[in-house]
Design a protein with these regions (language model features):
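Hydrophobic packing within well-folded, soluble alpha/beta domains
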Residues: 49, 58, 75, 97, ...
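Short, basic and Ser/Thr-rich N-terminal targeting/leader segments
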Residues: 52, 91-94, 216
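Glycine-rich phosphate/adenosyl-contacting loop at the front of the ribokinase-like
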Residues: 1-61, 66-70, 77, 240
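Conserved phosphate-binding/catalytic region of the ribokinase-like
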Residues: 1-6, 29-30, 194-303
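Glycine-rich phosphate-binding loop at the start of an alpha helix
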Residues: 39-44, 144, 261, 265, ...
Length: 303
């Protein structure tokens, strides 16, 4: 049966520029390539899930400007359900400028739209008939309501622990079942050693079962409630082209594998492989892999 997922949170208009190298001083810089796309953590995770074969939905606050039509066309083209998305009168959307160098590393400059700050009422029917829920912290009110409902209904719920105000993460982490932090996100939640931060997340509420922090090329550190923290090395790929969307691909793939019943280690390996493959492809989340590509890649790995 096809997995059904919903990603609740942020969508943004992405303006992506490719350059050879980042300058070391303020200057004008020629871009070798330009691409306009759609990003945002929840939006990207929905696309990643759709490409893996899930029946994916996105639900997040959007404004009334022209970017909304771009968002809806993007989701429609990539098979993501947006039936619950309604533009908010008088509000604006988020926009990001993403600059990627020849090594695949990137800088992101973002402006948060007013729709995230004044999202209107949350529609609880968006969680009906879902198998797994993802939430990001950009619209705290909606993330909180989505995760509370998921817990009440016994739905697996994954929080994207991206860097955010500490108060927001401290409000949301205890509502998650699994939480996947970026390194800066974990430091915002609990400054100090990674292992202490993961332990703090697990201690925040008995319902939190797994906490993980992704560390780029160094892999990740993860911990299941009642067990010691463990390291998982990152997968090596021949050439990194674009890391934009790799974290969101990881989150979508982690939710996909988890909801399908894989063990925590199996789900983390699947997600790590998906993120590694995404890094070999350009154009942000459009480079997220299909399920058969991830499984073929994993079959070539020794461990």
């Amino acid at each position: 049966m096809t997995l059904r997922s919903i990603s609740v949170g942020h969508v943004a208009l992405d303006l992506m520029f490719q350059i050879d190298a980042f300058p070391d001083h303020p200057t004008k810089k020629h871009a070798d390539a330009f691409f306009q796309g759609v990003g945002g953590m929840a939006a990207n995770s929905a696309v990643a899930l759709s490409r893996l074969g899930a029946k994916a939905a996105f639900y997040g606050p959007v404004g009334e400007d022209t970017a909304t039509s771009t968002f809806l066309q993007h989701f429609r083209r990539l098979g993501v359900d947006t039936r619950h998305v309604t533009p908010l009168h008088g509000q604006t959307n988020s926009i990001s400028a993403i600059v990627t160098d020849a090594s695949g590393e990137r800088m992101i400059y973002s402006h948060k739209g007013s729709a995230l700050q004044q999202p209107g009422p949350f529609d609880p029917t968006c969680l009906e008939h879902q198998d797994v829920v993802l939430a990001d912290p950009r619209c705290v009110i909606w993330a909180e309501q989505a995760m509370k409902l998921a817990r009440q209904r016994g739905l697996p719920c994954l929080l994207d622990g991206e860097v955010s105000p500490a108060a927001d993460l401290q409000r949301l982490v205890p509502l998650s079942q699994w939480v996947a932090f970026s390194d800066p996100g974990l430091q915002a939640f609990h400054p100090g050693p990674h292992a202490d931060g993961l332990a703090s997340a697990l201690d925040s509420d008995p319902g939190v079962e797994l906490a993980v922090v992704t560390l780029g090329g160094e892999g990740l550190l993860w911990q299941v409630r009642g067990q010691a923290a463990q390291r998982l090395a990152g997968f090596k790929v021949p050439h990194v082209v674009d890391t934009t969307g790799a974290g969101d691909t990881f989150h979508g793939a982690l939710a996909f594998a988890w909801a399908q019943g894989q063990s925590p280690l199996g789900a983390l390996r699947f997600a790590s492989a998906a993120a590694a493959l995404k890094c070999t492809r350009p154009h942000g989340i459009l480079g997220a892999p299909h399920q058969d590509e991830v499984r073929s890649f994993l079959a070539t790995q020794l461990v």
